[in-house]
């Protein structure tokens, strides 16, 4: 059976004043399906996000998408909550990756020239607690602001949310990345966190903004202070977030650079259920809201 065609894309664009942050205009594209995903961001005439490999690709390795109602890996695609055991569909071996929404179609509630709002019901997506997730993406001449919220339904729920951008690697040279964190999470070989922290080492220490070189990172940085700063030969990108975002996953395969701000750790529902403290997992009371915002602000080297 063939899948239905994707919903029409939303196109955002903002004119850039001459001599300020770059030529022409800033353009963004949002695909309601799959995943309510930011699928393109053109700054200074250059595409800054890894593109969709093909029209049928509904995987995680392109664009920028929201992770909810959990982030990263969920061990064995299951967790216990208030005396009950809940299971979900595995999509990475025996584990469940990046929540329930990155491959589903979102409903568009507003589409203007510089702002888009989308939402999706969690119940039909397979979340037994119900609720709704909303996101707003707002574009300006020198920034993109994304706000997301999870609103509980009639039941309290465990939740976390985060963003998973795939930034392109520059063809002009190496990139540097600053993350203000002294610790990462220890993981098993399959990258499931053990719940223990470990100090950064020569490979994972990004506090001074080193060149990435050939580092192949896939690490969760905790208690992150200050912005994340990605510097490429032709663009400086400063990533900030609200105070409830203190975890960043950094993934640097050859195909792109992922800088993922999150309200909680990967596998937070499982770890919190084992008594691990500091996971960032939030209990959302009935009809209450978990909300967070991240902002990407850019400038061009040599321009004021």
Model-derived segments and their meaning:
Residues 1-86, 224-245, 288-301:
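Beta-strand-rich N-terminal accessory domains
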């Amino acid at each position: 059976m063939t899948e239905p065609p994707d919903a029409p894309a939303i196109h955002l664009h903002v004119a850039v004043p001459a001599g300020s942050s770059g030529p022409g205009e800033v353009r963004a594209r949002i695909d309601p399906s799959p995943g309510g995903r930011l699928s393109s961001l053109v700054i200074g005439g250059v595409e800054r996000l890894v593109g969709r490999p093909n029209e049928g690709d509904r995987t995680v390795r392109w664009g920028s998408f929201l992770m909810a109602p959990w982030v990263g890996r969920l061990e064995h695609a299951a967790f216990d909550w208030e005396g009950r055991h809940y299971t979900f569909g595995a999509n990475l071996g025996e584990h469940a990756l990046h929540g329930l929404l990155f491959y589903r179609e979102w409903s568009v509630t507003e589409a203007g020239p510089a702002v888009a709002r989308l939402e999706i019901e969690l119940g039909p997506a397979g979340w037994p607690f119900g609720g709704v997730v909303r996101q707003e993406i707002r574009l300006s001449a020198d920034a993109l602001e994304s706000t997301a919220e999870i609103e509980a339904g009639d039941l309290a729920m465990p939740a976390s949310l985060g963003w998973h951008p795939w930034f392109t690697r520059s063809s002009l040279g190496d990139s540097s990345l600053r993350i203000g964190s002294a610790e990462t999470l220890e993981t098993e070989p399959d990258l499931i966190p053990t719940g223990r922290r470990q100090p950064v080492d020569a490979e994972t220490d990004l506090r001074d903004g080193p060149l990435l070189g050939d580092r192949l990172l896939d690490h969760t940085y905790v208690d992150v202070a200050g912005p994340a700063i990605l510097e490429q030969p032709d663009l400086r990108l400063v990533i900030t977030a609200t105070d409830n975002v203190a975890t960043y996953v950094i993934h640097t395969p050859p195909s792109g650079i992922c800088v993922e701000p999150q309200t909680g750790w990967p596998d937070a529902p499982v770890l919190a259920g084992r008594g691990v403290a500091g996971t960032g997992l939030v209990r959302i009371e009935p009809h209450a809201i978990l909300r967070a915002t991240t902002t990407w602000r850019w400038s061009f080297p040599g321009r004021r």
